[in-house]
Amino acid sequence: MRMKEDAMKNGQLKPGYNVQVGNENTFAIGYDIFADAADMRTLPVHIDNVQKRLEHTFEMVIADAGYGSEENYEYLERNGSVALVKYGSYHQQRKKSFKKKIFNSENWDYDSEQKAYTCPAGNRVPYVKTVTKETKNGYTHTIDLYQCHSCEGCSLREKCTKAKEGRTVQRNEKWLAQKKQVNERLDKEENKKIMKRRSVECETVFGQIKGNQHFRRFHVRGTEKVRVEIGLLLMGYNIKNLMRKEQEKKAA
């Protein structure tokens, strides 16, 4: 997999493991090792494993934008967990500059009854067909396709599309509804405070292990051996964390 540390700056592939750690109040409460570099695909498995070990279902799951996807939002809803998880374009889409991008179909007028968009040139972009796409995890996306039939001779075509057949638009109703729900949820003041706390708590675990303890690579090979090594590291982290909190209580 590709590492964050890339001295040659050429995106070279290196053998490695994707470590997922769940934490609560700065303590590590569960971890998993994956050969998959994509954090997004690890969330359901990681949550299931930690819940099974703890015999507890999480009422709320908080994660960064690397975990936000249609599949994960649906999984968390099915799990009975409130998702405080941003999606990849969350911050970008909330900027004023994003609303000014007239060629982005998310800024176009949409007629739900007629099932058609209106493009920047004022032309209709009607519904054509529905297709499905399957992820590596076997999850199926349902996507509606729209296509403009008035691109020929349009003065805005060069800025709008380079496709020979004209501008096409993909619309995923479930994904749009999920993003709207996420936006509304994250706009609540109490949830803003929780998200700020998340950035501190989650980064503390890896910050301590990688930054302060200078642990940058595993000393063993094989998933099971790596699982033991990271488990010992996290156990040590939790013990030190508990001792620090006890000392702070005594000092207070």
List the predicted regions and their residue ranges:
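Anion-binding and metal-coordination hotspots
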Residues: 1-252
